[in-house]
Amino acid sequence: MNEYFVNLNIKEMPETMRPREKLIARGEDKLDEAELLAIVLGSGTREMNALELARQLLARHGGSLRFLMSATLEELTAEKGIGMAKAVSIKAAIEMGRRVVGNIQLRRIIKSPEDVQEAVRELAMEEMRHYDREHFRVLYLDRKGGLITMQDISIGGLHSSIVHPREVFKTAVKKSAASMILVHNHPSGDPTPSQEDIEITRRLIEAGKIMGIEILDHVIIGEINYCSLKARGLI
């Protein structure tokens, strides 16, 4: 961004550099991450406009929107220039995007191992690969393989927050699910399963056999790719 425009109000900038006007004229896909974030923020501070605030916020986190996916309100408001109103707007925008994707994908039918991996790629990969903490998510399916719902069971890591069968199967029973797909991410970016990943999966599979609920796969998501424990022959 040209330093000449740093301390200007957005309205004082040339129209071609204003995020909202650029979106209207050229389309949302022509905006970079900072410009999109500036629109969500709505306004800047006394020291900088919304676009510069967005650029500085991203710069503090490696230039990526990744941290916004799992940031709490407390973490957002700890950032310079981000008050509660801006933090709430960010959280609402992230959640709205998540729900749009979720509503589309809930129509999916999953019947084969290939369907499982495709569903994980399209439903969870893009979102979960950006998380900086481990999220353990479960996709619940009906008897025909239809996706009923999905739910994050644990946040914080399999090591610090052990996944208990009770939490995993509570929603399955409530929703009358016939099978499940387990998904979690590795913030390190390497989807290689740990021994603990394998042991937890096998423990959940045994619990599922008792309850008559099949676990179809456990997919671990990394930064670039993913690992299916089923495809690896680990379960």
From Swiss-Prot:
Keyword Cell division: no
Highest taxon in the source lineage: Bacteria
Residue numbers binding Zn(2+): 184, 186, 197
Protein name, entry field: UPF0758 protein Swol_1642
UniProt xrefs under PROSITE patterns: MPN (PS50249), UPF0758 (PS01302)
Domain MPN: 109-235
Entry keywords, A to Z: Hydrolase, Metal-binding, Metalloprotease, Protease, Zinc
Gene Ontology biological-process annotations: proteolysis
Residue window of motif JAMM motif: 184-197
UniProt source species: Syntrophomonas wolfei subsp. wolfei (strain DSM 2245B / Goettingen)
UniProt-recorded Gene Ontology molecular function terms: metal ion binding; metallopeptidase activity
Family to which the UniProt record says this protein belongs: Belongs to the UPF0758 family.
NCBIfam families associated with the record: PRK00024.1, radc
